[in-house]
Amino acid sequence: MKVSLTLLATLCASLASAGVVITPVHQDQVVPAAQKVAGDCFFGVVTPQGCAPLRT
């Protein structure tokens, strides 16, 4: 049990440090359409930090 909990905590820390954690953003954090480049983001919307799902 302790080993699996340790592995899970290590995985979560690794994903968070790699910037893989997906945080929904608000409309005021989205890059305007005129500044986007085709293929910038295959899901969600483009933000200054990268791609993210839009919070509605």
Swiss-Prot record:
Question: Which N-terminal stretch is annotated as signal sequence?
Answer: 1-18
Q: What is its main location?
A: secreted
A Gene Ontology cellular-component term: extracellular region
**Summary of the knockout phenotype:** Impairs pathogenicity. Forms pressurised appressoria but is hampered in forming penetration pores and fails to differentiate a penetration peg.
Q: Where in the cell is it found?
A: Secreted
- Induction record: Expressed at all stages of pathogenesis.
Q: Which UniProt keywords apply?
A: Disulfide bond, Secreted, Signal, Virulence
Q: Give the family per the record.
A: Belongs to the MC69 virulence factor family.
Subunit: Homodimer; disulfide-linked. Dimerization can possibly extend to multimerisation.
Role of this protein: Secreted protein required for appressorial penetration of intact host epidermal cells and for pathogenicit, but not for subsequent biotrophic and necrotrophic colonization of leaves.
Q: What is this protein called?
A: Secreted virulence factor CLU5a
